[in-house]
UniProtKB/Swiss-Prot annotation:
UniProt record similarity statement: Belongs to the LysR transcriptional regulatory family.
Listed GO MF terms: DNA-binding transcription factor activity; transcription cis-regulatory region binding
Keywords of the record: DNA-binding, Transcription, Transcription regulation
DNA-binding region: 18-37
The organism of origin for this protein: Streptomyces antibioticus
Alphabetized Pfam families for the sequence: HTH_1, LysR_substrate
Keyword Nucleus: no
Protein name as catalogued: HTH-type transcriptional regulator AbaB
Keyword Transcription regulation: yes
Length: 301
């Protein structure tokens, strides 16, 4: 059986689409379709059911993928191991949310770039979870940081760390509300405070309210700015309350620029995932960065 046909088959199985598999393989869609049909003729069985959007593997397709994929990944690892001495000089294409990537991920990965300029080179893109996972699926990125665990066989996700969300405001707002008022009265104590958020839907505030107060926020956004660092700056300047990751506002809390309005027994958490295309950890530079970040993240929690 032709290994090239098996490689195409496994890629289609993971991608769930001839179009996406063609992009990952650097082939035309007709070429991918032709290779799958050739393999199906050789086996005498259909491997995929064609759907309106993508393809679904048949039982024999799932069985073949289960048997073939680990061996193909091992062959890739063997082939790439010859590049191991040079893998430090290869380029890693990384994508993730701007704040977490800037504050946590990039400082950690600089340890792989090398003092002599001969280490790993980085190319970084920022985007939403949907954008970064789509880019990873299409082959634009090697590694993605996401707060959404991807579905399907194409992408493999590893939990990286949990970030704690904190309800903060400038000290004058805390003084205006009064000590322990939020703890005693709950969400209504905050109804008249302006809100600083990253989006009109108030994703951070809504998640916090649902988790801690078991209700939706009554207020709308007073300042909407699509960057958590800008949200912190606005909150520090007195623009209103905000819900922020603790790692991002820790220094501002230490300096007294903002204060916590409530310290719940169980604070809201959000999980970050380290995501790769299934099988690409056989590539030394991807595996090295993946392991490096997993180790670094043990100090982030």
């Amino acid at each position: 059986m032709d290994l090239a046909l098996l490689r195409t088959f496994v890629t289609v199985h993971r991608a769930g689409s001839f179009t996406r598999a063609a992009a990952l393989l650097g082939l035309s869609q007709p070429a991918v379709t032709s290779q799958i049909r050739t393999l199906e003729r050789q086996l005498g069985r259909p491997l995929f059911l064609r759907q309106a959007r993508g393809v679904t593997p048949t039982t024999i397709g799932d069985e073949l993928a289960h048997r073939a994929a680990p061996h193909l990944d091992a062959l890739v690892e063997i082939a790439e191991s010859g590049l191991d001495d040079d893998s430090s000089s290869r380029t890693l294409y990384l994508a993730g949310p701007p704040e977490f990537t800037t504050e946590r991920v990039l400082p950690a990965l600089t340890g792989l770039t090398g003092d002599d300029g001969q280490g790993l080179t980085l190319r970084v893109s920022f985007g939403t979870a949907e954008e970064t996972l789509e880019g990873l699926s299409c082959g634009r990125h090697d590694l993605a940081i996401s707060t959404t665990r991807p579905r399907g066989a194409l992408l493999s996700a590893t939990p990286l760390c949990d970030e704690e969300h904190v309800l903060v405001a400038a000290p004058r707002w805390a003084e205006r509300i009064g000590a322990d008022t939020v703890r005693l009265k709950g969400a209504p104590a905050l109804d008249d405070l302006p809100v600083v958020e990253v989006h009109e839907s108030l994703p951070f505030v809504s998640r916090y309210w649902a988790s801690v107060f078991d209700c939706a926020p009554a207020a709308t956004g007073t300042v909407i700015v699509p960057d958590l660092r800008a949200v912190l700056s606005c909150a520090s300047a007195g623009a209103g309350l905000a819900v922020l990751p603790r790692y991002l506002c820790a220094r501002a809390l230490e300096q007294g620029a903002v204060v916590t309005l409530l310290d719940p027994v169980v604070p809201p958490l959000r999980t970050y995932f380290l995501v790769v295309r299934t099988g690409t950890l056989a590539l030394p530079h991807v595996a090295r960065a993946h392991e490096w970040l997993r180790h670094a993240a043990t100090a982030w929690c």
